[in-house]
Curated annotation (Swiss-Prot):
Provenance organism: Beutenbergia cavernae (strain ATCC BAA-8 / DSM 12333 / CCUG 43141 / JCM 11478 / NBRC 16432 / NCIMB 13614 / HKI 0122)
Record protein name field: Small ribosomal subunit protein uS19
Function, as annotated: Protein S19 forms a complex with S13 that binds strongly to the 16S ribosomal RNA.
PROSITE patterns given in the database record: RIBOSOMAL_S19
One Gene Ontology term, aspect cellular component: small ribosomal subunit
Location of the region described as Disordered in the Swiss-Prot/TrEMBL record: 1-25, 74-93
Any Pfam family matching the protein: Ribosomal_S19
Keywords noted in UniProt: Ribonucleoprotein, Ribosomal protein, RNA-binding, rRNA-binding
HAMAP family: Ribosomal_uS19
């Protein structure tokens, strides 16, 4: 269920402050964050965020198609290593 429109989008205050500071200065440094729950707003465009996935920070460059999604959607938390290979030689023994 989506968030109510009367509440507005959720963005952590410290993250919004960092983006606003960089927008006024005109810099595009990487912003390290643990806030996977923050919604991507149009003023995030062109910035790179280092989003924490539980182990490391994954770089996420924000494009226009990402607006309206959450930062955590672009930093997967689980690594899929694939299923075991079907090895016929091992089965024969």
């Amino acid at each position: 269920m989506p968030r109510s429109l009367k509440k507005g989008p959720f963005v952590d205050g410290h993250l919004q402050k960092k983006v606003d500071d960089q927008n006024t200065k005109g810099t595009k440094n990487v912003i390290k964050t643990w806030s996977r729950r923050s919604l991507i707003t149009p003023d995030f465009l062109g910035h790179t965020f280092a989003v924490h996935d539980g182990r490391k920070h994954v770089p996420v460059f924000v494009t226009e198609a990402m607006v309206g999604h959450k930062l955590g959607e672009f930093a997967p938390t689980r690594t899929y290593r694939g299923h075991d290979k079907d090895d016929r030689k091992a089965r024969r023994r």
